[in-house]
Amino acid sequence: MSKINKLEHIRNIGICAHIDAGKTTTTERILYYTGKSHKIGEVHEGGATMDWMEQEQERGITITSAATTCRWQDKIINIIDTPGHVDFTIEVERSLRVLDGAVAVFDGVAGVEPQSETVWRQADKYNVPRMCFVNKMDRMGADFYRCVEMLKDRLGAKPLVIQLPVGIEENFKGIIDLIKMKAVIWKDEALGAEYFEEDIPADMKDKAEEYRAKLLDMVVELDDHVMEKYLSGEEVTAEEIKRLIRKGTISAAFYPVLCGSAFKNKGVQPLLDAVVDFLPSPIDIGIVKGMEVSTGEEKDFPISVTEPFAALAFKIMNDPFVGSLTFIRIYSGKITSGTTVINTVKNKREKIGRMLLMHANNREDVKEASAGDIVALAGLKDTTTGDTLSDIDQQVILERMEFPEPVIELAVEPKSTADQEKMGLALSRLAAEDPSFRVSTDYETGQTVIKGMGELHLEIIIDRMRREFKVEANIGAPQVAYRETITKVCEIDYTHKKQSGGAGQFARVKIIFEPLKEVKDLKDEDKNKIFVFESKIIGGAVPKEYIPGVEKGLNNIRETGVIAGYPMIDFKATLVDGAFHDVDSSVLAFEIAAKAAFREGMPKGNPKLLEPIMQVEVITPDEYMGDIIGDLNSRRGQIQSMDPRGNAQVVTANVPLAEMFGYVNTLRSLSQGRAQFSMIFSHYDQVPSQVADIIKAKK
């Protein structure tokens, strides 16, 4: 197969969903039926191939996205298995950035759950075409049609039903294919490898006709010629329907909905057919956004084998056998072992050593990879998540990923002097792997503080520190990661002068600080940022080479705010004027001036303390509703909605994270263990003044 042809045959897909919807099981079945796995791994036995970290096998959840390659028909499918637990949404975000399409797996009993909504929003952000697989159709209480309604109501999605279930709960035995208008039934004794087509059961004929008509109504809208044919009563062929479903899926006009039971081995092969038939190849995506280093211009780069090499590093992983592995998605050109490329974000050269195709935790050495491939590189020195690797002669920086701010922090102390050094190494390695995990030192206490997206996230980091790096540490109680911001515009003109013997230092900066939400002409790419810097220097008042010093100074100093030393977020700094000295000015002098300007200027911006607000969803039997709502209100919660779901009630509320520690035990006692809850970070909001005073006093 020629390289150019090969691009059409690649599908880079992610499998993502809520925890326990059956993503890993679905992936396991895909590997089994595509011949990559000779024994089916069961998650609840701790044997799943994709869940290869010890912590994942023990907990039965997927933490890191393992990438694997398999073949179906004559296509190459690169699958990224993503975690569904809210503490690991960053993994999902990174995966979606480099995928061309996704399969969203839903639990046939629970339908669209909170984490499903988060993943769906993330996929919207990156415009990832996707289809839906309603799983667990064999389970008690499974309801395919309710799930389809929830896709509309909760996600605002336009579902295109292309299959219907045959039988429900323990009698679920197959599907109706609405494109071919045939029933597909699986034989239980053959582990789902054998299935056959038959006529649609008589009692389902009417329903199948009804959903087939809905399907045709939606797809013919995409093609005038087929629409005329359909309206004049002519038969629309299966090929035409498939072509239009593909067109609509790629343009996100709708989302095909399939069903099955991965655990019971039913519905997986048609899902694979649909991945190949409907999800895009790299050619369908066509372009990737980036910046040309030589000109600084933003432009669209074609995805092609014949273009210069460009790839995005989207994950770092420590492998016990190979050491540090950097997963890259190649967007254009090709690469061979032994080549030298450049990391354009860090401006450092990297030599490509071993190149591996990954199958969960098995690996295959390859000598060459090209556009569309996802490979792991061993031994890169300076590359971290979100960096671009590029051809040395034609350098580009691909669009970077934005990572959320951590919401929870813990103090960690090594148990012995021997652990001290090992802990530093372990934490820096783990932080390189995971951009949503941060490590810092508290200047006042000298303690090492680790920050992450939730209690489970930090628990697993500490667990990995013990197991992989053999570090024993004492762990403090979890603390809320507060932030600070300004609420009004302020301007500061600051001059830094030092002329006492030897080389002097001189830098003058005039900076306007303003709250992000008050910036009128904020660029689209800056809307999700927590700090925006812009230079409006005209006529060389501050030479170009010194301006990065101003940005660096502000970026460093904003980590310790002016109220209680928490990082400052959601503001814009604009450098409007300044002055320099031919001899005494330097990048460092401007960095120092910017830091001092921040310290002096920020108190004038009416700074306020911010706290993380969580979206909490509680599912409870009716009789405990009153107590649960009363308790949420007492935690400074704001009830957003109350909806019935089956025979239970679903309460959604926004509650400060500071009030949610230990909530699991309270909920258990309020509902005699019958209610359950989940929470996702929603946004930062101002802390009420009486609470802010207590926080400041503690600092």
Curated annotation (Swiss-Prot):
Domain of life: Bacteria
Summary of the function given for this chain in its UniProt record: Catalyzes the GTP-dependent ribosomal translocation step during translation elongation. During this step, the ribosome changes from the pre-translocational (PRE) to the post-translocational (POST) state as the newly formed A-site-bound peptidyl-tRNA and P-site-bound deacylated tRNA move to the P and E sites, respectively. Catalyzes the coordinated movement of the two tRNA molecules, the mRNA and conformational changes in the ribosome.
Keywords, in A-Z order: Cytoplasm, Elongation factor, GTP-binding, Nucleotide-binding, Protein biosynthesis
Protein's UniProt name: Elongation factor G
Domain tr-type G residues, every copy: 8-283
Location within or outside the cell: Cytoplasm
SUPFAM superfamilies: EF-G C-terminal domain-like, P-loop containing nucleoside triphosphate hydrolases, Ribosomal protein S5 domain 2-like, Translation proteins
Gene Ontology biological-process entries: ribosome disassembly
